């Protein structure tokens, strides 16, 4: 989804060799379903009341660093002009595919590699690295970003299959509800 693509772009821009391991046949399928296929990529209102969980204030530092204005500026920079309706920002094309396409192009431009139809079999810590075993080969990484969508949209790949790996590395999981 958008979070995984944005994280991969940020990782590559920070100088890391970055690979997306995607178990679906295409990266970013969930984006196509957002905003009824129009992809509202940000909102004018982003207060604490918009967030769920045990600690909604956890989001505050993130939005101080990359707020709504920076989000709009980022998307403009990569080719998405906004169309604003009722406080929601959509691409001017009103097509979610536009957002997916420019995110994938920006990821490729920054050096991100995509490996699709890649099922993760195991992730193990080996010293300073992680060994990621997949159906298409093994990968070593200093860091892993889990951007799985969990149960948001099983048809687009967000099916919860990464949850055991996330829990294995000590992350506390709160009650999960599907959401785009």
Language-model segments: residues:
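N-terminal Rossmann-fold NAD(P) dinucleotide-binding loop
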Residues: 4-5
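Glycine-rich FAD pyrophosphate-binding loop
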Residues: 12-36
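Conserved dinucleotide-binding and phosphotransfer motif residues
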Residues: 14-16, 78, 110, 169
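Hydrophobic anchor at the start of a short beta-strand
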Residues: 16-19, 82, 144
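Glycine-rich active-site loop/strand segments that organize a redox cofactor
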Residues: 36-86
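Flexible, glycine/proline-enriched loop segments at strand-loop-helix junctions
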Residues: 58-62, 89-94, 148-156
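An accessory alpha-helical subdomain
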Residues: 67-76, 86-110
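Predominantly flavin-linked oxidoreductase catalytic cores and closely associated redox partners
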Residues: 97-98, 102-180
């Amino acid at each position: 989804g958008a979070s995984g693509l944005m994280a991969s772009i940020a990782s590559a821009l920070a100088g890391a060799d970055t690979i997306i391991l995607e178990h679906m046949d295409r990266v970013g399928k969930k984006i196509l379903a957002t905003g009824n296929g129009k992809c509202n990529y940000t909102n004018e209102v982003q207060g604490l009341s918009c967030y769920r969980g045990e600690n909604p204030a956890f989001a505050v530092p993130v939005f101080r660093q990359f707020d709504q204005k920076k989000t709009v500026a980022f998307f403009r920079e990569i080719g998405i002009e906004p169309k604003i309706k009722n406080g929601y920002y959509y691409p001017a094309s009103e097509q979610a595919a536009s957002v997916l396409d420019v995110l994938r192009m920006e990821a490729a431009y920054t050096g991100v590699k995509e490996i699709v139809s890649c099922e993760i079999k195991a992730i193990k810590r080996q010293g300073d690295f992680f060994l990621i075993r997949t159906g298409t080969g093994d990968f070593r990484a200093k860091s892993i970003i889990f951007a799985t969508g969990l149960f948001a949209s099983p048809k687009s790949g967000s099916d919860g299959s990464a949850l055991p790996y996330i829990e294995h590395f000590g992350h506390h999981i709160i009650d999960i509800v599907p959401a785009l």
